[in-house]
């Protein structure tokens, strides 16, 4: 089965990690060579703990947050940041034609 050609547009970036939240925080820490590593809590293993995140900013319903595993909350939070970055959050006419990866 032949697949139709599709245009792909990257319109927003959502990133949260041990370096912080958003592209700017990441670039600043990467350029300054400021790793965020915890070498004591789970020694001898090095851990890069997630930066403090207010999940309420992207997942307003506490019930939704309670039903999610940590990885789901982080992914949903990052997706919300990407929608904010793209400027399409709260615009159903655009969101109804959009796929997220």
Regions found by a protein language model. Give the residues of each.
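Conserved "HGTGT" condensation-loop signature of ketosynthase/thiolase-family condensing enzymes
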Residues: 1-101
């Amino acid at each position: 089965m032949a697949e139709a050609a599709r245009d792909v547009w990257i319109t927003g970036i959502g990133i949260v990690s041990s370096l912080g939240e958003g592209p700017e925080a990441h670039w600043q820490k990467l350029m300054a060579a400021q790793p965020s590593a915890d070498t004591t809590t789970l020694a001898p293993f090095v851990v890069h703990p997630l930066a403090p995140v207010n999940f309420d900013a992207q997942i307003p319903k506490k019930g939704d947050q309670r039903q999610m595993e940590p990885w789901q909350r982080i992914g949903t939070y990052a997706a919300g940041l990407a929608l904010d970055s793209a400027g399409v959050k709260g615009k159903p006419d655009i969101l109804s034609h959009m796929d997220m990866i």
